[in-house]
Amino acid sequence: MQFINELKDGDVLKSVYHIKTKSQATAKTGKEYFNVQLSDKTGTIDGKIWDVASPGIEDFKAGDFVFVEGDVISYNNQLQVKVQRLRKASNDEFKSEDYFATSKYDKGEMEKELMAFVDSVKNKNYKKLLNAFFVEDEEFKKKFLVHQGAKVVHHSFVSGLIEHTLSTTRLAKKIAENYDDINVDLVVTAALLHDIAKLNEISSYPENDYTDEGQLIGHIVLGYEMVKEKIDKIGGFSEVESVELLHCILSHHGSTEFGSPKLPMLMEAYVVSQADNTDAKLQIMRETIANTKITNKMDQNGFVGNNKFAGTNFRESKLK
C-alpha cells in the first residue's frame, strides 16, 4: 500500500485507492479528460486521466475502489497523479481500514478485551448467548470488529463499534460493581450486546449510510430481535433472564426522545443507558475538540461553540 501522505514527486504509483469523486472536464486546449480524487486514510490526491478511452474508465464510479497505475507529478506546487492505467479493484485487494479513519486502539487487543468480558460472565445462559454471537458466529464477529459505531455522530470510524462497546461495558461494569444489589452479569451482557444491530442499521464502508431497515426500524428494535432470536434458539432461559436482558436492550437510549420504546425500569438498565450515553457524549466532545483544533475555530478561551449533539458549549480542561 502506497499511502497518499508518503507520496513524492517522481514516484511510480501502483496501488488501490478509494475514488471520492469522478468527473469529466475539458482542458483549455479543448482536450477532454477525467478528474478523479483518490483517497485513503491519510488524505486525498487529485488524478488526471488524459486518455478518455482508457480501458476500465467506464467500469467504476465515485465510491468504488480502483487499482491505479501512474506517475506522481508536481503541478502548481501540488502533487497529482498522471494516471496511465486503472481498473476496478476486487474485494480481496484492499482492507477498508486502510482507507477510512480507524480506531486508535489495536483491533487484536480490543478483541482480547471483548473475550475477557465474555469469559467474566458467570451466568451460564448469558455466557451461552455471548458465545453464540462472539465465538460461534465467525462472520458476525468479523464484521463487529471493524464496523463503525455510527454514521456521523460518534465513533464513526473503522472499529468504532467495538471501541464504543468496550468503553460502555467498562463504565457499566465499574458502576455495577459499586453496588451489591445490581446484577453485574446482566449489566455486562447487555452492554456488550446493546449496539450489535448497528451492523444492520448502517451499511459498512465505503457506503456508510442507513439501510432501509435501519431507517424504518432502527438498531434498538433490530437488536432486540437479534437477541430474542438467539435466546429462543439456545433455549433454557428463564423468563426473568430473557425479559430483563431484552428490557436493557430496548431501554439503552434512556428516553423515548432518543428512540428507546421503554424507559429504564431496572437499575441494571439504567446503568447500561448511562454508561452508553456517557461514552457517546465524551467521544463527541473529544472529536469536536480535535476537529476545532485542526480548523482553528475555537474562540479565544478555547470554547468550541454550541454543539447540538453534546447539547452545550464546551472546551478542553486547561489543567495538565
Regions found by a protein language model. Name each.
Residues 80-146, 222:
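Extended, charge-rich, solvent-exposed interface segments
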Residues 127-171, 193-199:
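A short mid-domain helix/strand-loop element embedded in enzyme catalytic domains
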Residues 1-13:
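OB-fold nucleic-acid-binding modules
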Residues 268-320:
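Acidic, carboxylate-rich catalytic segments that either coordinate divalent cations
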Residues 152-154, 163-164, 174-291:
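Divalent metal-dependent catalytic cores for phosphoryl transfer on phosphate-bearing substrates
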Residues 35-40, 204:
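Short, acidic/hydrophobic/Gly-rich beta-strand patch recurrent on exposed beta strands
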